[in-house]
Each structure stands twice: as structure tokens, then as C-alpha cells.
């Protein structure tokens, strides 16, 4: 039988710290959040493996290192208001909710949103608002946001999301074609100017929506 506490500690040390991520608060949260609760029960023994896993509905839970890297790139503080596009399993949501004041997260697939809500409630992460809808349009009535994280690959940075960044805000998003993307970090200056930093290559499921890929593309 798998000892999940030991597996989680090994995941943090080997997959996250071992690849150069050393932010103390981040590591503490990854050590606490039970990733195995966010995957299908039959796959729980693989939850801390070094790779993505299917979660149903043709979606995946990202590799632990990628979750850590994208979270680290957001440069979060405890007071941040964060928007997540693509709730998926809810694991990334749980990481964010453990680090910041409040999280708003959008999932287009209702069964995934409902399952994520169930697990988040079990963990008493009550600072999360979930809605089902088109994530590429953001959540303008709750913005602006200090940080926005997109967990699916986009053909370009959605203008709607960039517009919902607060001055000083950070947007992390994979951009490319439907098979391969590059991780980008967008910063918004006080005057509204956007600057872009280019990160590693990555592979995410497509971002579906009005400012993403079309469902039948």
C-alpha cells in the first residue's frame, strides 16, 4: 500500500526542488495538499508520479513540476486575488487557494467543476469561487486580478484576460498550437503596458472558447 505522505515528500524533493524551485511557501503547500484526492481512485497510486494523468472528459491533471513552475512564476503574495482558467481536477486550484486570499476559477466542463468543488470543500478550502463557463472571457465582474493562471494551451494571449489584470499583475499562460506550446509570463505595468517573458516548452490540452480554440478545430 502506498504511503501518500512519503510519496508526496519525495515528489517535492525530487521533482520540484530537484528542478530548481525553492520558494519556501510554495514547497510547504505542495507538501500539504493531497494530490491523490484529485485523481480517479484507480489512479491514486500514480498521483505523485512525474507526469500528467487523465482525469476524464479528455482532460488531464498536469505534471507536479509544471504546476509548481507555473505557480512560482505568478510571484504570489498572501493578499493576492487570483483568477484560474481551467479548474480541471481542482489540484492547481487547491495550491493557489492555500497561497492567496481568494481564487476565482472557471471550468467549461460541468462534471469536472462539480468534482473539484467536492474535493475542495472536503479540504475546507473555502476561499474559492467556481463557475462553469468560457474561461477565455475571464470573470470581469470580479476583476481586476493580481494574477491570472491559464491551465490550457492558447493560440494567443486572450485580450480579455490581459484586460482583467490589475496594474502590477502577472498572467502565466501556455501559447502555441494545439499540440505544443511555450510558457509565457505577461506583466502589466502601472500605465497598462504589457511586457512578455518566454519560458519553457510545454504541452497542454487546448484552451476552448471564444478567444481560444474552437471545440471542433
Curated annotation (Swiss-Prot):
The active site is at 62. Its main location: cytoplasm. It comes from the Bacteria. Keywords: Cytoplasm, Methyltransferase, S-adenosyl-L-methionine, Transferase. It catalyses: [protein]-L-isoaspartate + S-adenosyl-L-methionine = [protein]-L-isoaspartate alpha-methyl ester + S-adenosyl-L-homocysteine. Pfam families: PCMT. GO terms for biological process: methylation; protein modification process; protein repair. CDD domains: AdoMet_MTases. It is an enzyme of class 2 (transferase). One of its GO terms (molecular function) is protein-L-isoaspartate (D-aspartate) O-methyltransferase activity. One of its GO terms (cellular component) is cytoplasm. Its EC number is 2.1.1.77. Coiled coil: none annotated. It is found in: Cytoplasm. Belongs to the methyltransferase superfamily. L-isoaspartyl/D-aspartyl protein methyltransferase family. Catalyzes the methyl esterification of L-isoaspartyl residues in peptides and proteins that result from spontaneous decomposition of normal L-aspartyl and L-asparaginyl residues. It plays a role in the repair and/or degradation of damaged proteins. This is Protein-L-isoaspartate O-methyltransferase. It comes from Trichlorobacter lovleyi (strain ATCC BAA-1151 / DSM 17278 / SZ). The gene is pcm.
